């Protein structure tokens, strides 16, 4: 059972993500501390400090988060005393520029499935940081920018296995 504080953290995170998806920059920023940081780890996209995070959200994320057919499914959530970790399955068709995920890559029209882990820190009832992880090689393979032949790289299969652990493991 979550404590009152943990329930507030979850509600704030859900408000934050909802504002991102709705393209509401002011509400997105209102959920964050005065000195937040944001790091999309595989691409190092993000920002530091309120002005840096706001600029990143304005220019690259809010209202431009994913193509219109995006589907997200929460797989698991762990809530601690000052942090939350959300594991998410995401699928979309790469029909728009998604430069935080694929900087400099024009839309390919390819279907993408990915498992994402979001680590969210909280301080004084606000989000202090987000560290976001995914398998960039798998995404690049799915859109045709990386040939997985001979490499220890999978594509959509790795994301699907997060949803269904009974799927066969890859044997090397």
Feature map (PLM): residue ranges:
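C-terminal and inter-domain tail/linker signature
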Residues: 1-172
